[in-house]
Amino acid sequence: MEWFQAVMKRRKALKIGGISAMTAIGSIGVMRSVLAELDFDLVKETRTKMGTLVTISVVHRDVSIARTIIDEAFVEIDRLEALFSRYREGTPLWVLNREGILENPPSEMLEVLTHALEIDTLTDGAFDVTVAPLVDLYSNSFEEVGELPSEVQIENALSLVGSQGINFDRDKIVFERDGMSLSFDGIAKGYIVDQAVKIIKKEGVRGGLIDAGGDMRATGEDLLGESWRLAIQHPRNPGSYLCLIDLSDGAVATSGDYMQYLTEDLIVHHIVDPRLGTSPDHTSSVSVIASTAAEADALSTATLVLGPEKGIRLLNELPGVEGILVTKDQEVIKTEGFSRYEVTI
């Protein structure tokens, strides 16, 4: 990743039918008569994938071709989801977590693992795919006894966390400690969206958008030949948005305490600091704009863990990356260049 290398050198839709973390918004107030004169059609379809609703939109002159492209993109999503699911028996990740070794790992898994370890280094461990034992500990504790795990349990789980415990090459992935496991939840969805967008980028396609429950990747133009307008959800006001942004070719992803939580006060949620073993208590949500959904996905999680000061400072250091953060006190903090994408209506 060019931005990773650069930083390390230096450091040595209108259709709001319910706003998710991000929602595509079409141009507002356009007359039907104007739309009727357009040479292109907007075709969109929503299916349940990767544990969320995934909507794929394609702008094309031929509706049937657009539908075929959308079908092909969903096929690619299915193929990759089968590689990265840690709950589906027999998947490569399931085998690795169960056996502690995976022979002949898929090239896609090696690519994502390499990317994840780069971000681990960049964030000083705030993003760590070996966090799975901690995430599972919290989930199982609340499911089985309805309360937080004990300090001893957390310490035991923490002993299994740390990317230095992963050894891999093109032939195998091996854990150095028994009980380790990986979760690509903070990066795989973005990666899968990126690969599906490659399917959309075909001759004759004016533009496309994939919305995967908080991870969005835009390419080209919308139906009116403009940038895709997206709404970022407010973390404490369901159904309303924090801000609007315009994207032509790029991605935006949101991580938030409200997305999956274990306590009603949102203090304990699905994101766990892999260094401390607890959910971050300073940030409600982070949305990151980057060139790819994988980068935006991982960096939004890492920034939420790092918190306002360190997180925003990190994003400001990264070329081509911008972000917006909402603290637990509902203070809104933006990176220096975020306004380039923000839209005022």
Task: Give the predicted meaning of each segment.
Residues 1-345:
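Mature catalytic core of soluble alpha/beta enzymes
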